[in-house]
Amino acid sequence: MSFADKVLAVNDNLPIRTDLPVHSGKVRSVYWLTEQDSRRLIEEHNYPVPKDTPLAIMLISDRISAFDCIWRGEEGMQGVPGKGAALNAISNHWFGLFKEQGLADSHILDIPHPLVWIVQKARPIMIEAICRQYITGSMWRAYEKGEREFCGIRLEEGLSRDSKLANILITPSTKGVLKGIEGVPEADDVNVSRSDIAQHYAAFNFNSADDIALYEKLLTEGFGVISHALNKIDQIFVDTKFEFGYVKDVDGNDKLIYMDEVGTPDSSRIWDAKQYDQGNIVENSKEGFRQLLLNYFPDPDILLNKERMDEREALARNNALPVQVLMDISKTYTQIAEKITGQKIVLSDNPKEEVISVLRDRYQLID
């Protein structure tokens, strides 16, 4: 059996019982359960939610996306072996730590399989909640061009690339295209200031202006928990993206929670601390794959320029990367997951059949 067989690339075609279209994202697919199945699972498994809460199966794939495109390899390799299991394992670990330390809950109610979450429906805050501890990436590119204001924050003079910032900075961007907000362009992933959010908090889906401070508190506290834990294993938590939303608690009241994934190599930059101390940047995140792509293709502007999206999509569609590139990414993801969780990431021989078997036999969600 080849490594290509161990990859779950297509994750939106499982025969899970649902009466709504499957939502297929870049990496995860969401199957909304029927009202009857949601109620049954809540009762059978004593999930701490109102009995009428909509539930979903969230199934992660091994696909790898970068620069808003999905990339594939030669020899039929349609993803990265072990990537999905590594991402879920890392998120599960951090969500567990958050709960231990009295931070907010997540949307996850159950974990039937390393690739599967059972989640409750959440109403998302329309913000990519980005937290930065070092100046790198898009912030550095803007700074290098002479920009000194980033998301409404004034940056001091004399900063150097990849250096640690004096304070952790919150630099949010829009989640999706938001319309009709003065001063905010109608485009995806646009940087916004705290002032933008405060003036239009309802448009960003906050229940109240006070909840802006709550999301910032949960963001910085969550960042701190992960950063402290990574320091213990000689890793640096450089920057990250969190997502938040509202769910109903068991009494039917709204509560703000963490959602999607947290502190993973997909949503964060993680550097090797010993190498950083020696003046080297060694990525233990998807940023290493992004840098490889920028160096691999002769015209990196295609990957960075949003106005060349058609060319970028053609580049991803028409170019199969060497298998070794994807295997190196697999090693990065599985090794950092094992360091963080202390548990080995085991590759399934047939992940799709495993998931079907669990959801059919233990949860009766497949006829």
Swiss-Prot record:
CDD domains: SAICAR_synt_Sc. It is an enzyme of class 6 (ligase). GO terms for cellular component: cytoplasm. Pathway: Purine metabolism; IMP biosynthesis via de novo pathway; 5-amino-1-(5-phospho-D-ribosyl)imidazole-4-carboxamide from 5-amino-1-(5-phospho-D-ribosyl)imidazole-4-carboxylate: step 1/2. Keywords: ATP-binding, Ligase, Nucleotide-binding, Purine biosynthesis. GO terms for molecular function: ATP binding; phosphoribosylaminoimidazolesuccinocarboxamide synthase activity. GO terms for biological process: 'de novo' IMP biosynthetic process. InterPro entries: SAICAR_synt/ADE2_N, SAICAR_synthase_Vibrio-typ. It catalyses: 5-amino-1-(5-phospho-D-ribosyl)imidazole-4-carboxylate + L-aspartate + ATP = (2S)-2-[5-amino-1-(5-phospho-beta-D-ribosyl)imidazole-4-carboxamido]succinate + ADP + phosphate + 2 H(+). Its EC number is 6.3.2.6. Belongs to the SAICAR synthetase family. This is Phosphoribosylaminoimidazole-succinocarboxamide synthase. It comes from Pseudoalteromonas atlantica (strain T6c / ATCC BAA-1087). The gene is purC.
